[in-house]
Amino acid sequence: MDRYLPLVVFLAFVLWRCDSSKENKTTYHPHKLDTVPYSESVQVGDMLYISGQIANVDDDYNKIVEGGIRPQVNQTMINIQNILKKHNATMDDIVKCTCILANGDHWGPMSEEYVKYFKSHKPARTTFGGAELGDGILV
């Protein structure tokens, strides 16, 4: 019996950790626009998932920052920071990003602006281009 004690203790620990009824509570944070079919963000336990953001100005989703990819990346990152702030988080808390570009040729300039927002670490990232994002939306 003594030789199985470590296994029993390990299994008990694993099963205890799997009881996530309180730890992984899911909270859906509604989007500012009640016409969209998704949440602005969803929190599961301590993890916050943010829906895709664009370079809209002043909560007006019909007004996209002008001037090309760099200003759009910066406005998009500001919009992300604003959502994080509402949930007592910062860019330092981000662990994964997905960047979608209208034009793959914007990868370089987008990356140059993107890294300015991550001073303490580099989150995992997936980036792809050639997507139809909408009128005037580059990222």
Ranges and model annotations:
Residues Y4-V95, L101-V139:
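N-terminal presequence-like segments and the immediate start of the first folded domain
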